[in-house]
Design a protein with these regions (language model features):
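Hydrophobic helical h-region of N-terminal Sec-dependent signal peptides
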Residues: 18-19
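A signal for specific C-terminal beta-sheet/loop modules enriched in small/flexible residues
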Residues: 1, 15, 84-87
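Bacterial N-terminal signal peptides that target proteins for export
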Residues: 2-14
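C-terminal His-loop and adjacent cap/lid subdomain of alpha/beta-hydrolase
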Residues: 27-440
Length: 440
């Protein structure tokens, strides 16, 4: 692996983005090259170590996919250390140099997390990150830029926080730098890779929010000939300030992260985007970004996908704010309570985007074989069919998004009948056992 750096000095991050400088060494093809952003740029992981991302080039096309990895979120001490539960902020030790090539991290486990020694990038989390996956997708022949998440803020934060709720004697200083890191990656691509004939911004889970937040940043800096968005299982649901949690179940979460991650503070992502695109969004409602993007970029195709039975993103969204969920005695009862809120939010989310012809969506009911129906594009594309519409898997939606030859596909499964009753029942049972032990 070739170590690579992108910037020689720090510039004002509230003004123009840093310009890239020539790299040390020579880029390879069809191999993962590490890019490390220097500390002087303001980039870092949550623990203060350097932010690193990875590039897999091809000489045969300028088309490029940027992958924003999933990996949870955090706004308390144990979650940011990725301790006590799997459902916290991932990569609490930072990003290892061997992140994409070895399952075991080369970093010391300084956070004490039982999960951090595993390199998620080497797990094959998505077919989009593999040129040889049996789940085929057009972008496997493109240039691939893979962005790990290590800041616990779904790529949107700009705040140094101190958390001491779990251990007041040993407070944790945590760097929510996701917004800064992401903009620096965009600038690196613009300075070090050819202008893409087509740029796909793709993210799953936490990364799905990341690509939504930073779509405009990457478009402005990289200036691709054509650009598309694929956001999988990380929705920004309607949550206007001043609303009620009964009507908008994600409101307590949004209120919390605004403060914890500095979203509304000077230099935060909300005032920054509103200053750049005046009048296009509503500062009181993070979900206004969902409709701002198709307004700003009417010629770009934007696709959103999730599962109606996703208990994982629902748990992240609601568990810390609704005591009745955590106090329910069984995981089945907890999931039922989660999904009541989750499914209530899907309708208004889709309704807000329906007026825009460049927006499409693919919403199956369940995919029990993957993380309690979390994500349509993780690991494989299997079990993502919508039989009532004759759609065999999510790849039909992805091809429609990328080809651009027809109106955007809009597919929503109305049936809740299991596609494979016996298999789904067994998988759900195993998932319940697993997730109870992981803290769900």
């Amino acid at each position: 692996m070739i170590d690579r750096t992108s910037f020689s000095s720090r510039s004002g991050l509230l003004g123009p983005l840093l310009l890239a400088v020539p790299l040390l060494g020579h880029a390879g093809y069809f191999t993962w090259d590490k890019v490390e952003l220097p500390a002087a740029s303001g980039a870092s992981c949550g623990n203060g170590t350097p932010y690193k991302f990875f590039v897999n080039r091809t000489p045969f096309t300028t088309k490029t996919i940027v992958i924003m990895e999933g990996g949870g979120a955090c706004f308390d001490q144990n979650a940011c250390l990725w301790k006590g539960s799997f459902f916290g902020g991932s990569n609490s030790n930072g990003i290892a140099d061997n992140y994409m090539t070895s399952l075991v991290s080369s970093l010391k486990n300084t956070s004490g997390s039982p999960f951090a020694p595993i390199n998620q990038g080497a797990l094959g989390l998505t077919p989009f990150a593999s040129r040889t996956s049996s789940s085929k997708v057009q972008t496997q022949s493109w240039n691939i830029v893979y962005m790990p998440q290590c800041t616990g803020d779904v790529y949107s934060g700009n705040k140094v926080a101190t958390y001491s709720d779990a251990d007041p004697a040993h407070p944790l200083t945590y760097y929510h730098r996701g917004d800064i890191n992401s903009r620096l990656v965009a600038n690196w691509i613009a300075g070090n890779m050819p202008k893409p004939a087509h740029l796909l911004m793709y993210g799953f889970s936490a990364g799905a929010i990341g690509v939504t937040v930073h779509y405009g940043d990457f478009r402005k800096v990289i200036r691709p000939t054509k650009m598309s968005l694929l956001s999988d299982s990380g929705p920004l649901f309607e949550a206007p300030a001043g609303g009620s949690a009964e009507q908008y179940p994600s409101l307590p979460l949004h209120t919390k992260i605004r403060q914890a991650w500095g979203l509304d503070e000077p230099g935060g992502v909300v005032p920054r985007l509103l200053a750049e695109y005046p009048g296009i969004g509503d500062a009181s409602n993070l979900a206004s970004l969902n409709v701002a993007l198709p307004k700003l970029f009417p010629n770009d195709r934007m696709g959103f996908t999730l599962l109606q039975a996703d208990a994982v993103f629902a748990a992240y969204s609601y568990d810390k704010f609704y005591p009745e969920i955590r106090s329910a005695p069984t995981i089945q009862q907890r999931n039922d309570l989660r999904l009541v809120k989750w499914q209530k939010e899907i309708g208004p989310w889709l309704d807000s985007m329906r007026p825009y012809p460049n927006v499409g969506y693919y919403i199956p009911y369940a995919r029990p074989s993957v993380f309690h129906s979390h994500s349509t594009t993780m690991f494989t594309f299997n079990d993502t069919d919508i039989p009532e519409l004759g759609l065999g898997r999510v790849t039909a939606f992805i091809d429609d998004l990328l080809d651009g030859k027809a109106p955007m596909m809009r597919a929503f499964e109305t049936s809740q009948t299991p596609h494979k009753p016996l298999k789904d029942a067994v998988v759900n049972y195993i998932s319940d056992l697993l997730f109870v032990n992981l803290g769900l």
